[in-house]
């Protein structure tokens, strides 16, 4: 479904089950993850972050009407949270419903470990298992949180660049 958006993504070879869990088998992408490149060359973090943000914005510029809606996916996840009582789940669902209805492609797990830097420097995004259509700000918020868990400086750099460029 995401292929319909016209993004340059690895070819899906197979959908299969491994240890009774669903798995996507994609064509092999030669290179290193952007995360590895950033760790090896921290002096150029700003340059790599700019390329990373530009890549995410290219994704957000696309639409794919056949993708699952982000709000539907989040509503399902909220409803499955048994750690919360019904009132708490209801309050979250009301807040979710107030989110703007957008149809932008959202990767759902966009972080430097899911970007392969090819030998020619070309960036390729992998791990499209969580892709949806919805509010790009929610996708960016998830990316920010993933950065913040590992590196607060990188998280702030990401957020600043994303806000300036979007």
Please identify what each model-predicted range represents.
Residues 1-69, 83, 100:
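ATP-binding pocket architecture of kinase catalytic cores
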Residues 48, 136-139:
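An acidic site on a long C-lobe helix of protein kinase domains
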Residues 51-58, 91, 142, 161:
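Alpha-helical elements of Rossmann-like donor-binding domains used by nucleotide-donor carbohydrate transfer enzymes
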Residues 61-108, 118-119, 124:
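An alpha-helical support segment within catalytic cores of ATP-dependent transferases
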Residues 113-114:
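Conserved protein-kinase catalytic-loop position immediately C-terminal to the HRD catalytic Asp
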Residues 127-131:
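Activation of the activation-loop gatekeeper triad in protein kinase-fold domains
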Residues 140-166:
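Active-site activation/catalytic loop segments of kinase-like enzymes and analogous catalytic loops
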